[in-house]
Amino acid sequence: MKASEMARPPMRPGNPHAFASPATTPSRTASPNNAQGANVRTTQGGNQAGASEQQQPLDCFVVYELFASAVTALVSFFLVKDCGAVALNYRTFVSKVEPQQEEGKIVTDLDRLYWLTSVHVHWFSSGTLLVSTSTERTLALQCLGDLSEDEQQKLVDRCIRVAPNAMLASISSFDDPRQLSADDSNRRTSKKKAKMDSLEQNIEKWRMSVQRWLSRRGYSLPNLDKNSAWVTIRVGQLAQFPAMSPHLPTSARDVLWPRSLCFMQSLVPDDLKWFEVPGSAGFRDPIDAAQDWFTGQLERDKILDMQRKAKKAEEDAMRRKDEAPGLYPSSPFTARTGVYGDLQPVSGVYPTPPDGIVPGTGISSTDTPSVSGTASNVVLVPGGNTPAINLSAPQDYTTTDNQQHASTSPTFPAPLEPFQTSGEDDDLFEDMEGDGFGGPDVEEADFDFFDGPDGDDVNMADAPALPETTNKPHKQLNNDVAMAHEEEHSVKEEMSDPLAALESALAAPYRPINDGMPEEKVSEKEAKAVVPVEALATSPAQIKQNPPAKKEATPPLSPSAIAKTLQPSPPKKQSSFPASLQRTNSAFHSLDFSRRLSLVDAKYQDGRFAARIEKTEDDESAVNPGRLKSLKDLPLLNKLRYAVASASTAKSTEALSLARAVSDDSASDSESETSDMSEGSPEDPVDTHPLPYLGRLIIPAKRKLPTEGHGTPLSVTSFAESLAGDWQDSNSLLLDESSLTFFEPNTWDWSIPDLSMEPPEEKPLNGKESIAVTQILTDQIVSATLDLLDENALVESTSSIEPSSETRWQICIKELFPKAAECTLSALIAIHDVFPDLSAQAKGQQRPPPRKPNESNAIPSNHMYPMNPPFIRVRRAETHWDLLPPSIAFWEPLGLAPASPPKNVVAFCIYPHSASLRPILDRFMLNLQLAYDTCKLGSHARVETVIEYEGGLVPVKANSQTSAKEAFRALKDTCIQLGKLLAIQYAQLGEQQDTKIDAFVVYMVDPFGNPAALWELCSAFWSLFQAYGQGPPGRSDPTPKPDLVLQIIPIKYLASFDVPVILDAATYVSLAREVYDRCPPSVASTDKTPLSIYKAPAFQLEESLPRNVQFKLLSEPPQDLLRENSYMHIAYAISLDGNWLTAAWSDSCGKSQAVVSYHLGTRVFGDIAKEIWQTTIEILQARRVQWRVCIAKSGPLDREELETWVLLITCPTQVNLFLTILTVIEDPPYKFTPTTPAPSNSSAQANTNTPGSTPQTGVSPDPTIGLTPAATPSADPAPDPAADPEARLIDVTDETWGIILAHRLHNSNSTNQFSPALISGLLVKRGITHATSNSIHHPIPDPLPGPITVAVNILWIGAVGSTWKRAAESRGTQY
């Protein structure tokens, strides 16, 4: 297929998608199978209405899209690989701005500045391939990889864009899933730990797959092996993409993705700091703060002096404390008289809690052996042979680092300063070396055995939290022995119903594990609890082959070890654990006591040191949320009864093992427990970790699940399956490699919506109120001279950056296409389309059109011509003057006045309550009043209404600094109060003024700094308007009320926390004219045939007279001959979300204009277009003349929209219309870069010999500034003042050129879609360049540095009307 065959393609098939929004609806069905993700359009040859049955062998639309997609993919790969850019979608890239130093200063704010680069591929019918790039700078993007840890925690659930396909997602977590699984595995059985290991392997496999997938697309992201380089995101609405695999889910799932490929909108600053509320001083003038700081020097010196003295006193106190003080006789450390001290009495073997009584030094009882060392941590009951009672309790609270503990606290061991740990072995007992008292044979585990919790205190990670007490033991000591016997009897009973048994087990109150058990079992269970998990995986044979290494010297022996050696140990039962497994690091065996010791404990448990907790009237289930009253409270009750009705019997074994794992294997019947363990398989690991957390199900200890003895396929398998949920499934982590197809680039819209505002808590607005608020918001933005959307920050931050940001992309493309030629402006204009010659029968005989008298030669189509700036009409000395736009800057010196009559207003200002902000607003309102009066716009007065609103300043007082919702609610209440006040006192306010009040202007200060907050401000003004329109109840006043006008003032124009804000006079004058334009006309229009949308602006464009007046007889003569062939411009734009459409009407001079917003959420575009067209006809019927109507849309025009407009405008009307439908593209595929030629030697010599005031021979304007329209001859001895460029004051940044291209641009958002327009052209404005940025002041700067380019595509031309019906049928053209 040749490129020339695309010159006249066949009828393009209709768009398969119904119209929703051109910004959100792709023009073609997406298919992410190809490299560019849905760039290839499927062939739809058979869907054409009226097409011939014989199909062409090749579809030019498909061929064009395939070729353009391939070229775009190639360029994209190398831009990512060589330039380090990140592809946001198939042709849009984001990159970091490189810091550059210019004129001795480094540009700031570059850490937040990004480049957005778009690649455009255009294949012309002449065979020329044009690849271009356009780059914009933005501060609205922020990469997750550049965030700090503090900022990350605030961004959970925030909306982000995921590269490389710009998919919408939300941040789920910044934590590593493997760490979460590790924490979760501590509460699970060993089989679950195996699943956790599998999850870690799957996560690692997923990361490797993502790295390979990205490397094939040119990415080489650093530090992907670190956990900090990944983030867990939640991807939703996967059903919008075609299913690549049938087993992949379409619901929201979590995905691990690199942080450097995730972007979001920049964080908004704190918007409540301006309000003065309790606990916050609000705004403070930086000048006052500096003055207070200067005058407070003496006070600061006093404070510093006091701090130095206090620090010195503290150091002296610490130094005295460090000195060795004398020990009191009552101190337990007095027993340490020597290195080891004399033997002192020890009345027990277990440590006591910190609040226990330490026995004094003396002779011990005959039943208690004595040994030297620290005092035992026991409590002694008065009596000779009474054994000690251990009151140690588990520490169920979290200890902070700075918390102080007693010397006997289990958190910090008792200090051992007098002992020597140099490694020397001191033999205290000489003849007892054979009994195991050798120094090297004693290990730290011997002492940890007694320091750790006893059998009654087993740490369970998932046990319900016990109440914190300071000086009372726990509740577990109340009636333990009696309940223990009852439990032993109840556990042995068998129940016929497994559900009843499980319910009975769950309903029992939770108590310690070892209640009522003999001390022999306590020691064995404690030994099991301290065995690490790694030791369980080692066989006994391996332990025997690996003896412990040489041990270092340990502190002196414990009293319990000596007592155990001196006294014979009672016989103990054989355990299924090898001795090496139970205490691998200990040289001694565990101490086993007889049952009589427990009976003795029971005897003295109600002694003086017993703690009793009062019973509360509340239900125990409310105090202990971990215990459930009944199985009906369990969320998995249905699974226990019905879930596994179809489960096979083969699952019973696995379910039994799971149930046995979560049950306690240490019941009172120890013999049966030992036999069960011995009969188990040797491969089954022993459960030694804490009890698992099973949702809300808490399995009490010391009980066997009834399902273990009464297991059936229904009861056992359902219980096992309900507890065997995998971490991966429960957290919806998507680790399937085939899911990477969801991240393929596509042609969907990638604009980031602003979701930072919280939804209002109040009742939402209805449809009419929403449209009214939108209308108010539209009026504020369309005619704003202040920076409401914070767009000037981008211009200020990029003003000193190098103008050419396309160099790096051009170098990469040149290396990719070595034979490609660099495109210049003249070369671009010369690119033309090839039109095949039509047959002679269809073409017929062509005759050149007759030339008119005095007509010059035809202008070629590929021509660039300058467009002179229009004149502006103002009033001076009661006469209308037409001046050039630069004269507006000299409004006051020239004594200019608005072209329309003056408008008198009364002003009020709503601001956040702050004592420091009020005087600033007072000065601001005074300066604005002076500017309004100086420009002769009318009167701008402030009146006294109530005491609270002195000087027209209305404060918004917030009760508390909680959230933005509270501030918006306070603002709305203040507006309602002001509206009611104006409705009552507007007549009195009019009597106070000498002139008639045309409008009440409400200045509303915007302290939020967020564009999304503008909606809330306009909504509050709508509440004010409603309260003002209703008026006082029970009274109707026929006097017309003045209109209400809103003017939003960003807070940055008033005050700042850092520097004083001082506005220049030009800003006040521009704002005064803006307020004038917002007010309605004070008098009616003086035109002969006025339009219904008369606006009465401060100045307007000149009304040019017609070149000729046709004096001829017509059946319908025009009403106004001087206004024949008048223009009416209709422009509209659709929001990115497709919910709103804003249309604007304006005549050629701007005297009559209007802006209206429509809601597309519940209506189709055809209904909105019909309403816009009917409104247009009503406006034009007021003036029966020949109208030229231009319907323009911002952005590409879909085929359905074009067909709708053509259907509407071709209907006969009573007005003669000549219509043109066109599109305006603000970001065209072409971006111009001005070149600066080097000056020649001859011109340099001429400049040195010529005075600076003499005009030089050259071109005008200066070529060093930018583009040059044409050359001008040298100065003539008798120059014409009208032709002299220096005779007029011209703003060089406002110069504009029109370019008519010889080729056609595509009417599409996609660079791969073949959709040529009828005629294409460019509008190029010089704009602010580096040569003019410092010499010309612009109150309203351009959004981007110049040259600024706008593309215009004409799609349809025709004429309709009573006298143009035939012309419409013959001249109407549709592509």
UniProtKB/Swiss-Prot annotation:
It comes from Phaeosphaeria nodorum (strain SN15 / ATCC MYA-4574 / FGSC 10173). Residues 666-685 have a biased composition (Acidic residues). GO terms for biological process: positive regulation of transcription by RNA polymerase II. This is Mediator of RNA polymerase II transcription subunit 13. Residues 22-51, 397-411, 1233-1259 have a biased composition (Polar residues). Component of the SRB8-11 complex. The SRB8-11 complex is a regulatory module of the Mediator complex which is itself involved in regulation of basal and activated RNA polymerase II-dependent transcription. The SRB8-11 complex may be involved in the transcriptional repression of a subset of genes regulated by Mediator. It may inhibit the association of the Mediator complex with RNA polymerase II to form the holoenzyme complex. Keywords: Activator, Coiled coil, Nucleus, Repressor, Transcription, Transcription regulation. Residues 1-51, 313-333, 350-370, 397-417, 537-581, 660-689, 841-862, 1233-1285 are annotated as: Disordered. Its main location: nucleus. Belongs to the Mediator complex subunit 13 family. Residues 313-324 have a biased composition (Basic and acidic residues). Component of the SRB8-11 complex, which itself associates with the Mediator complex. GO terms for molecular function: transcription coactivator activity. Residues 182-216, 297-324 form a coiled coil. Pfam families: Med13_C (PF06333), Med13_N (PF11597), MID_MedPIWI (PF18296). One of its GO terms (cellular component) is mediator complex. It is found in: Nucleus. Disulfide bonds: none annotated. It comes from the Eukaryota.
